[in-house]
Amino acid sequence: MEVHVVSSTVIPQSLPPTETTKIPLTVFDMVIPNIHMAVLYAFMPPTPTNTALKHGLMKALKLFPTLAGHLSGNNDRRRPSVSVGGNGGGVLMVETNIALELLDILPLEPSPKLLQLHPQTDIAQHLLQIQFNRFSCGGLVIGITNHHRVADGKSMSSFFVTWAKLVRGLHIDKFPVYDRTMLIPRDPPRCDHDHWGIDFQPFPLPPSSLPSPLKSNKVCNVVVHYSVDFISKIKAQMPRKHSTFEILAAHLWKKVTRARGLDLDTLTEMSVAVNGRSRLRPAVPSEYFGNMVLNTIPRAHVKEVTEGSVADVARLVHDAVGRIGDGYIRSLIDFWEINSGDELVSVADVEGPVLCPNLEIDSWLGFPSHEVDFGAEGSLCGFLPSWVPVEGLVILKPNVVGKGGVDAVVALFEDHARLFKQISHSLD
């Protein structure tokens, strides 16, 4: 696939340079890895013009100004912020042509080739980067990267939906919330939970905390589809009610661990991303723009995971998720305040590219991908990460091509991936 770049421009911030506002990053922004995230949306023709998309984008950025801002003090682990207005910032917009029909590359599955469909993340100069990839048939793939410390997946989903509505000329009735007063520490602050080694590490890092180099084994991305019928069969095995996420997380933990062939007495962990908005008291509005995701970590020995029932493993996941409540969130806010004079490093930044014997599972199931409709009657035919390079990372996403159910993107070494595909749908 040859991607021909037609133009590359920067959409400036909507505020004049004389008006500058600094929005401090919260502890929830800083516990997130310091990286750009990438996602692809693919649409069958007919699709709106790039000009229409750009005009809608400029309107959306007035509502989501931090996406066009710039990080100030990004190297200061104490109190960085997003500067809106002033010099710098803006959004990178790239336009490309591809001399293929979109059908020629469908169905889209994560691959290093798809990295061409969005701006590079490792040398990003802007918090938000967007690439419009036009195919010969009129099909469109929009590749987006955003700095994770400015917004989580829930926030970016709200941005995509708003942008799409503005392109279609629709009324916007939900606006982003930037109020940080909901996240202030208690007086006096106190830590009721241990956050060292779980959320943050002190700086400088001890040598034992540094990431290990990537092994020579090639990491590949496996996409497996779990139909509504298959999910119902797993739920039928449950003596108590569990969410779709919990049962699929348990099922995948079992299958990935078995595919890796680990010793039965090895301890394995699964990092689970939890949206904290509704878990704080009072709850943070769902429109809150920024990060409000925390990780919780169920642990067990390989024997318990591989030989235990799906119900047993789902209970481990359920109990770990349940530990993320108002008390834990308030404790983390206070931890950040108590250690305000120290340099802290997110544990997520020192994990490295190989998670084995552990894994991480992120859910995109609650993202309203079906509402990302830019009009012109073009139907959504792809919603996915471009490529997952981290061994042991799993992403659950809704299937958007009419099958329903859930797609799981699983990044594993090749030899483990082959076995995983063979056992991915076994119910034992």
Give the location of each predicted region:
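Soluble acyl-CoA-dependent acyltransferase catalytic core bearing the H(X)4D motif
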Residues: 4, 8-20, 31-369
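Detector for long, low-complexity, acidic/polar
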Residues: 23-24, 28
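Low-complexity, glycine/alanine/valine/leucine- and proline-rich hydrophobic stretches
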Residues: 349-428
